[in-house]
Amino acid sequence: MDTAAQKTLVPGDVHAGGEAGRSARPAPSLSDSFRSTRALSLALAERLSDADATIQSMEDASPAKWHLAHTSWFFETFLLRDHLPGYRLFDDRFPFLFNSYYEAEGQRIARFSRGMLSRPALDECIAFRRAVDDAMEPLLGREDCAPLIALGIAHEQQHQELLLTDIKHALFQNPLGPAMFDRLPDTPQHKGEGWIEHQGGIARIGQDCADTRFCFDCEGPRHRVLLEPFRLSRSLVSNREWAEFIADGGYRNPALWLSDGWAWVNREGIEAPLYWHGDQHFTLAGWQDRDPDAPATHISYYEADAFASWAGKRLPTEAEWEVAAADADPAGGQQMDRAEAVQPAATPDLFGSCWQWTRSAYLPYPGFSPAEGAVGEYNGKFMSGQFVLKGASCATARGHSRPSYRNFFYPHQRWQFTGLRLAQDI
C-alpha cells in the first residue's frame, strides 16, 4: 500500500451551518479546506495505474484522471483566469478536454469520448493540478474570491465520490475482478428499529444560503410545505430484505413496477441490484461475500419504487425526509474523509451510509433563481426528469451531510451508493 495514501486527509467542511452545526468539530479555514481536499483527490488517484485512471466504462461515468483534471479546470476557469492578474492557462487545449457541461465556456469533447483521452497521461494531469494549486495560493485569503473557492471545494468533493463510484464500475467490467483497496473497512451493523412519526402540518424545508457558510443554490430558498401525517423507517432496506424481494419474484411481477421501470427491467435484463452475483457482490476491495444485514445499495429509482410497492409501503417525499431528519446529527453517520475503502453499513443514522431515493422530482423550489454567468449552469439546468436523493453515502465528503442537501439522478441510474428507506401514511 502506498504510504502517501495511508495518511489521514480530511476534506474541509465547506458547510457546517444549519443542523450540521451541532457537531463540536471546529470548521477548518477555507485555505486548509482547499489544500486538504486537493490532497485527498491525489491520495485516491495514487492507488490507480495510468490505465486504471484512463478507462471509461459507460457514458455516465468518467475516467479518474478526467476527474482530477476537470476539478483543476474549474479552479483555473472560474478563479485563476478571472481573478489572478497575468495568469496564463496551463495548456490552451485543456478547456476543450476538461470542461464538463458549461455551455458558456465554449465547446468541449463529447462525454462518451472522455475514455479515449490516452493523452494527457495521468502524470500530466497531476502536474496540471499542482500548477493550479500553486497559482491558487494568492487567492485563498481574498474575501472576494471566497464564495467561488467554497464552491470549487464542494465541487471537488462531489467529484471525489464520483471518482470512487466511477472506478468501481470500471473495475467491475474486468473479469479479473481487480480491487482499488486491499480490504473493506470494519462496518459493524447497528440497524435502527421502528419508525420516525410526524403528525403533519406546515413545515419549512430548504436552506437560505445567505444564512449559512455554504450551500448549493438548488437547496434554497427556504420555504413552507404542507405535510400529511407520515412515518419514516429508522432503518434502510437491507440485503436480506432485498433477497426476499427477489425470491418472491419481485423482478418478474409487472404489477409492482412503473411502466417505464418494467420496460427498463425487460430491456436491460435486470434481475438484482448492480454488482450482485450469487451471494457475493463487487466492492472497491473486489469480490466479497455480501453481508445480509448491510443496506441494499446500487439500486435504481425504479427498483426502489417496486420494492416499496412489494412491501406495502412507499418512498418518502424529499420534504418528509428532510423534516424527519431535522433533529438528526449529520456527523453521526459514516464519512468519506480519507483515502481508504468505503462500504455502506446499517446504522440508526439517517446520514452517511447510502443515498436514499425519494419520490420527489428534482424541481426548483419556489423563488429559486440560478446564479448569473457560467456557474449558474451548475444545478438549475438539470431540473428535468430526475429524482431527489437524500442522506449522503459512505463515499460522501463530511461537509455534504445536511438535511437540505439535494442529490439527483435519473430513475434508471444505479452506479452510485443508492438505497432506500420506506415511508407510509398514518
Label for each model-derived stretch:
Residues D2-S62, W66-A135, A146-A150, A154-L171, ...:
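Disulfide-stabilized, aromatic/cysteine-rich ligand-recognition loop
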Residues G152, E156-Q158, L162, D166, ...:
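Functional-site microenvironments in short loops/helix caps that host divalent-cation chemistry
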Residues D133, E137, W195, I202-R204, ...:
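A general secondary-structure boundary signal
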